[in-house]
Amino acid sequence: MELRETKVAVYGKGGIGKSTTSCNTSIALARRGRRILQIGCDPKHDSTFTPTGFSIPTIIDTSQSKDYHYEDVWPEDVIHRGYGGVDCVEAGGPPAGAGCGGYVVGETVKPLKESNAFYEYDIILFDVLGDVVCGGFAAPLNYADYCIIITDNGFDALSA
């Protein structure tokens, strides 16, 4: 299977191992010569901690520092190089109870597409929180060619 310009959404409930799976998959594919962008789609913004070694600024933090003018957000402001050459972005989200984190996921793609950075990768992997009610977290499915669901045999994991 040829993986060029492929977008993959990884879903699962919190603590199930989706970020670990996403990071390991991203690094393994980067080691095989693929250009990888991993987008963390969780308000906790901890998806890309493993490849970068630190908590990277989110798209929300960066756009807030520019008075929410997305046209002033450049790829180099939000894309951070991690281990093995994996490029990483974190969507972030509003404070708890202050807005829709899922909306942020959709808005994360906008500046990346407008700057054409979205099209520079062989594989874009969305690491998405899957156990919340907010419908905005389905936004990566609008872009994804494939969806991976990380689960175990517990009822909660399957219903998330």
Swiss-Prot record:
ATP binds at residues 15-20, 44. GO terms for cellular component: chloroplast. It comes from the Eukaryota. Pathway: Porphyrin-containing compound metabolism; chlorophyll biosynthesis (light-independent). GO terms for biological process: light-independent chlorophyll biosynthetic process; photosynthesis. [4Fe-4S] cluster binds at residues 100, 134. Binds 1 [4Fe-4S] cluster per dimer. It catalyses: chlorophyllide a + oxidized 2[4Fe-4S]-[ferredoxin] + 2 ADP + 2 phosphate = protochlorophyllide a + reduced 2[4Fe-4S]-[ferredoxin] + 2 ATP + 2 H2O. Its cofactor is [4Fe-4S] cluster. Its EC number is 1.3.7.7. It is found in: Plastid, Chloroplast. Keywords: 4Fe-4S, ATP-binding, Chlorophyll biosynthesis, Chloroplast, Iron, Iron-sulfur, Magnesium, Metal-binding, Nucleotide-binding, Oxidoreductase, Photosynthesis, Plastid. The keyword Isomerase does not apply. Mg(2+) binds at residue 19. It is an enzyme of class 1 (oxidoreductase). Component of the dark-operative protochlorophyllide reductase (DPOR) that uses Mg-ATP and reduced ferredoxin to reduce ring D of protochlorophyllide (Pchlide) to form chlorophyllide a (Chlide). This reaction is light-independent. The L component serves as a unique electron donor to the NB-component of the complex, and binds Mg-ATP. Belongs to the NifH/BchL/ChlL family. This is Light-independent protochlorophyllide reductase iron-sulfur ATP-binding protein.
